[in-house]
Amino acid sequence: KATHILGLTATPLKLQSNLGETGPYSKLVMLTNRSKNGMFFKFILHVSQIQDIVKLGYWSPLEYQSYDFDTGALVYNSSGAEYTHDSIARSYENQNIGNKIIKKVAEMADRKAILVAVPTIEQATNLAGRIPNAAVVHGGTPKDERKQIIKEFREQKIRVIVQVNVLTIGFDYPELDCLITGRSTASISWWYQFVGRGTRIHDNKKNCLVVDFVGSVEKFGKVEELYYKQDGKENWELYGEGKKQITGIPMHEIGIHLEGGINLSEKVDEDGSIEKIYMTFGKYKGKPVSSVPPYYRKWMVDNITWGPWNIKVKEEIERLGNFK
């Protein structure tokens, strides 16, 4: 007699980096293609889109505030799946993110529980020391001390926790009503998990405010706008706000491709030739390289680490020449 088994999960996806011909690319791993030793579940019958979950009232409403951030100095690590720790920390310092966070926290008297993400322990300690009623949590925080800080945070004796690579997965505090990110990331998984801390519903909060100082909203879009789409009979891909393609493309091109094969870094003429190369990072992101002031093109040549993620821009700068 045939047996039918229905699988249900609240975490249908896993994002991983695979090595392809053009370097690391992002892959959406569903329940039907996770194992190399055969699949227990053969078919996906239904996917609940995040938009549906929001409409049904299972997520707290999210509000976003985004600020200008120059991604030009960020460098991908050897895996191609994330930026290097040093370039993340330098960008935080060079763009004065700490002072911006301090000013923002002071403006938000209505927010009762604020979780802040920054790159390093030193930066977290410095920041928390300049914010009233704040504490630091990181991987080296003693277990008992961490438990006490979180307890006082839940009791609203501590208003702000500044964290370094912790409290991103599995941390559940429904009254959390503000998230601030000062940590750059190339990982949609990190962004999804971090914002997810604020999606729990609670009678004492009307929404969760997400304050982005590092360009994550521009790169990935709002988390509640992510959606899954089946590509053919078996493959699924993840897309974001504005139909940005998140998976199935090189990691360094997330935020550049749109659903339907549109590449935002190139403008193609009717005859199929490429008319212009567009900036894919930095303060002139979205502008033709040819319109970038010569002094800034010269600065990029002298300061940017070049790789597959920005090589087209470098080639266009070299073609244009003339930095005067």
Residue ranges of model-derived segments:
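Conserved helicase ATPase core of P-loop NTP-dependent helicases/translocases
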Residues: 115, 124-126, 133-168
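A conserved SF2-helicase RecA2
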Residues: 46, 50-60, 202-264
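DEDD superfamily 3′-5′ metal-dependent exonuclease/proofreading module
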Residues: 246-324
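Conserved interdomain linker/interface between the two RecA-like ATPase lobes of SF2 helicase motors
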Residues: 38-115
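Post-DEXD/H (motif II) to motif III coupling segment of the RecA-like Helicase ATP-binding lobe
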Residues: 1-63
